[in-house]
From Swiss-Prot:
Gene3D superfamilies: alpha/beta hydrolase, Leucine-rich Repeat Variant. Its main location: mitochondrion. The keyword Transmembrane applies. Keywords: Deafness, Disease variant, Endoplasmic reticulum, Lipid biosynthesis, Lipid metabolism, Membrane, Mitochondrion, Phospholipid biosynthesis, Phospholipid metabolism, Transmembrane, Transmembrane helix. One of its GO terms (biological process) is intracellular cholesterol transport. This is Protein SERAC1. It is a single-pass membrane protein.
Length: 654
C-alpha cells in the first residue's frame, strides 16, 4: 500500500474515532497525533512531488511527432504501457475516472449538438486519444444503414483534423466506409492510405512479359472471335507487326477520333496496348475476372497504371478492367486491399472528365450501400458521380454515332477563342462534355448517362463476326447494359447523334417485344435526334481511302441510302410510335462536312433526317457540330434544355 493511501486511512480513523474522555489528553494520544500529522505531511509532500513529476512527463514534447506528421503513410498504433507498476495507485485510478468523465461529457454533447467535434475538442488528449474520431468510427460500423451513412457524411465534411487523425480513420475503417468516403465529394484525400508496395518483378522480366503471362493464363476456349483475335495477336506478335496489323480498325470503347477526318491515319500500337485491349474483353466474363485476380492482375495493372501516367488511353483501359471486375461483389475485398480505392478517390477529383468518369464507374460498382445499379463496360454516369442527398427523378441518356465516343461526341464546339483566352467566367469556359458541365447544373435532379460502343468504318482485314457490328446486335447489347444500370425505373429522355438515333429506335422496338423491358417503353418521355439518317446516308460512297470504299463496315452499309434494313426499321418505328405518349425533336445539319482535305459531303441531308413525327429544326452547322453547341446560351443547347424540361415537366415537379 502506498504511503499516500496509508495517510488517507489514518486520517479516516481519526475522523471516525470517538471523542476522548473529558478527563484530559494523555501523552499517548498526543504522540499519536504527532505521528499521524507527520505522516500526513510527509505523504502529502511525496504525493505532490509524484504528481509534479507525472505532469512534467505528460507534457514533455516528443520532437519526432513533427516528423511523423510529414510521413503520409505512417502507421499510428495506440501503445499500451508494459510497466504494470504504472497501473496501480490512487493517482492512476483518479486520472482514469477523470478521463471516463470527460468521455461521457463529449459523448453527451455529440447527441445534443449536431456538430460536436469542433476544433477545441478535436485535440483533447484522453485515454482513447481522439474521442471524436472513435465515435465516428463506431457509428460507421453500426448495424443501422442510416447511421453508417450519416457517419461517412460527417467524416467527409471534417476538414480541421490533423494528419494523424485522418490516418486513424484510414487504418481503422471498414471497406464500406472507405468506399463511401471515396464517393463523397468533400472528402479529404488524407483519408486514403497509399496503396501497399507492389511485388517486385521477376528477374529478367518486364511489364510487357508479365502482361503476356497474365493473358496466357486466362481461359482460351469458348471465346468469341474478337477475344480470340486480340489474345492470339497479343501473345504471338511483336510490337512492330502489331502496329502494322492494327491499321486503325479497332476501336473498342471508342477512341474519340473525329468522325471521318482521319480515314487515312494508321495509329501505332504496342504489345502492352494490345494485351490491355484483350484483357478488357476478357474482363467482361465473370470467371475470367477471378483468374485475373488470382494471378496478380490487380497489382500488375496498378504497376502499369503508374508507369503510364502520361498516357490517358492506357489508364482508361486499365480502369475499364477494374470497373468490370468491380461488377463481381466477391472481388470487392481484393480490389480494396490492393489500394485501388485510394487511386480512384484521387482520380475522381481530376479535372479531366473522362478520367473522373471512369473512376466514378468503378466506385459506383463498389458502393453497394447507396447504389443498386451496376454499370457495365461502356456505361458512364456523368451526373451524379458522388453520393448526394438530391433525389434523382429522371434519366437522360446520350448515345453517340459512328466513330463517336461517350465524352468527345458531346463536347462544346471547338473554338480558337476558347483556347486562346484563358481567363474566363465559369459559364464561358470551354467544356469537353456539356451534358456534365451544363445540363447537370441546370437540371440537378437528373441522372445523366453516356454510353460507348465500338464502331469501325471498314472491315479491312477484320476478324470479328459480322453480326457483332449490326444495328440489331448493338441495340440488343446496349439495351441489356442499360437495363442493368436501372434505365426504365425512372422517366427517360433519349438524346442521340447520327447512327446512335438508329440504335435508340431499334432498342425501343426490342424492348416492346420483351415483357421484362416494358418499363423502358412506359417511362420513355422523349427522344432527341441530332442529324440521324432515318432514310440513309451516302457516307460509304465518299471515302478518301480506297480500302474503305471497297470494304465498308456493316454499320456503314446499313447507313447507305435506301438500305432495306433501314427502311424496315423506319416503318416499324413509325408503327410503334403511333399509340405512344412521348415527344420527338429532330435537328438536322445544313452545311457539308469536310471528308479529308478536298471533298465536302452533306452527310445527312434534310430529307433523310425527317423522321416523319416531331419537329424538324435545320441548323447552320455540319454533321460533326450538330451536337456540339458553341456556348451555353446557343440555340442548340437552349432548345435541347427546353425540350428536356417540357418532356419531364410533370416528373420533375413531383
Amino acid at each position: 500500500m502506498s504511503l499516500a493511501a496509508y495517510c488517507v486511512i489514518c486520517c479516516r480513523r481519526i475522523g471516525t474515532s470517538t471523542s476522548p474522555p473529558k478527563s484530559g489528553t494523555h501523552w499517548r494520544d498526543i504522540r499519536n497525533i504527532i505521528k499521524f500529522t507527520g505522516s500526513l505531511i510527509l505523504g502529502g509532500s511525496l504525493f505532490l512531488t509524484y504528481e509534479v513529476l507525472a505532469l512534467k512527463k505528460a507534457v514533455t514534447l516528443d520532437t519526432q511527432v513533427v516528423e511523423r506528421e510529414k510521413m503520409k503513410s505512417y502507421i499510428y498504433v495506440h501503445t499500451v504501457s508494459l510497466d504494470k507498476g504504472e497501473n496501480h495507485g490512487i493517482a492512476w485510478q483518479a486520472r482514469k475516472e477523470l478521463h471516463k468523465a470527460v468521455r461521457k461529457v463529449l459523448a453527451t454533447s455529440a447527441k445534443i449538438l449536431r456538430n460536436p467535434f469542433a476544433d477545441p475538442f478535436s485535440t483533447v488528449d484522453i485515454e482513447d486519444h481522439e474521442c471524436a474520431v472513435w465515435l465516428l468510427l463506431r457509428k460507421s460500423k453500426s448495424d443501422d444503414k442510416t447511421t453508417r451513412l450519416e457517419a461517412v457524411r460527417e467524416m467527409s465534411e471534417t476538414h480541421h483534423w490533423h494528419d494523424y487523425q485522418y490516418r486513424i480513420i484510414a487504418q481503422a475503417c471498414d471497406p464500406k466506409t472507405l468506399i463511401g468516403l471515396a464517393r463523397s465529394e468533400e472528402s479529404d484525400l488524407r483519408f486514403f492510405l497509399l496503396p501497399p508496395p507492389l511485388p517486385s518483378l521477376k528477374e529478367d522480366s518486364s511489364t510487357e512479359e508479365e502482361l503476356r503471362q497474365l493473358l496466357a493464363s486466362l481461359p482460351q476456349t469458348e471465346l468469341d472471335e474478337c477475344i480470340q483475335y486480340f489474345t492470339s495477336l497479343a501473345l504471338s506478335e511483336s510490337s512492330q507487326s502489331l502496329a502494322a496489323q492494327k491499321g486503325g480498325l479497332w476501336c473498342f470503347g471508342g477512341n474519340g477520333l473525329p468522325y471521318a477526318e482521319s480515314f487515312g491515319e494508321v495509329p501505332s500500337a504496342t504489345v502492352e496496348m494490345f494485351c490491355l485491349e484483350a484483357i478488357v474483353k476478357h474482363s467482361e466474363i465473370s470467371t475470367h475476372c477471378d483468374k485475373i485476380e488470382a494471378n496478380g492482375g490487380l497489382q500488375l495493372l496498378q504497376r502499369l497504371y503508374r508507369l503510364h501516367k502520361d498516357c490517358p488511353k492506357v489508364q482508361r483501359n486499365i480502369m475499364r478492367v477494374i470497373g468490370n471486375m468491380a461488377l463481381n461483389e466477391h472481388l470487392h475485398s481484393s480490389i480494396v486491399r490492393s489500394g485501388w480505392v485510394s487511386i480512384m478517390a484521387e482520380a475522381m477529383k481530376s479535372p479531366h472528365i473522362m478520367e473522373s468518369s471512369h473512376a466514378a464507374r468503378i466506385l459506383a460498382n463498389l458502393d453497394r450501400e447507396t447504389v443498386q445499379e451496376k454499370y457495365q463496360d461502356g456505361v458512364y454516369v456523368l451526373h451524379p458521380q458522388y453520393r448526394t442527398s438530391q433525389p434523382i427523378k429522371a434519366d437522360v441518356l446520350f448515345i453517340h454515332g459512328l466513330m463517336g465516343a461517350a465524352f468527345k461526341t458531346w463536347r462544346q464546339q471547338d473554338s480558337e477563342q476558347a483556347v486562346i483566352e484563358k481567363p474566363m467566367e465559369d459559364e464561358d469556359r470551354y467544356t469537353t462534355c456539356w451534358p456534365k458541365t451544363w445540363l447537370a447544373k441546370d437540371c440537378p435532379a437528373l441522372r445523366i448517362i453516356s454510353v460507348e460502343y465500338d464502331t469501325s468504318l471498314s472491315d479491312w482485314r477484320a476478324r470479328c463476326p459480322m453480326e457483332r457490328k449490326s444495328i440489331a446486335f448493338r441495340s440488343n447489347e446496349l439495351l441489356r447494359k442499360l437495363r442493368a444500370a436501372g434505365v426504365g425505373d425512372r422517366p427517360v429522355v433519349w438524346i442521340s447523334h447520327s447512327m446512335g438515333g438508329l440504335l435508340v429506335k431499334k432498342m425501343l422496338l426490342e424492348a416492346s417485344t420483351k415483357p421484362e423491358m416494358s418499363t423502358v417503353i412506359n417511362n420513355t418521355r422523349g427522344i432527341i435526334f441530332y442529324s440521324v439518317p432515318h432514310h440513309g446516308s451516302r457516307l460509304a460512297e465518299y471515302s478518301v481511302n480506297i480500302r474503305y470504299l471497297l470494304f465498308p463496315s456493316l454499320e456503314v452499309k446499313e447507313l447507305s441510302k435506301d438500305s432495306p434494313a433501314l427502311k424496315t426499321l423506319q416503318d416499324d418505328f413509325l408503327e410503334f410510335a403511333k399509340d405512344k405518349n412521348f415527344q420527338v425533336l429532330n435537328f438536322v445539319e445544313t452545311l457539308p462536312t469536310y471528308i479529308g482535305s478536298m471533298i465536302k459531303l452533306h452527310v445527312v441531308p434534310v430529307e433523310s433526317a425527317d423522321l416523319g413525327i416531331g419537329d424538324l429544326i435545320p441548323v447552320d452547322v455540319n454533321h460533326l457540330n450538330i451536337c456540339k453547341p458553341k456556348k451555353k446560351d446557343a440555340f442548340l443547347y437552349q432548345r435541347t434544355l427546353q425540350f428536356i424540361r417540357e418532356a419531364l415537366a410533370k416528373d420533375l415537379e413531383n
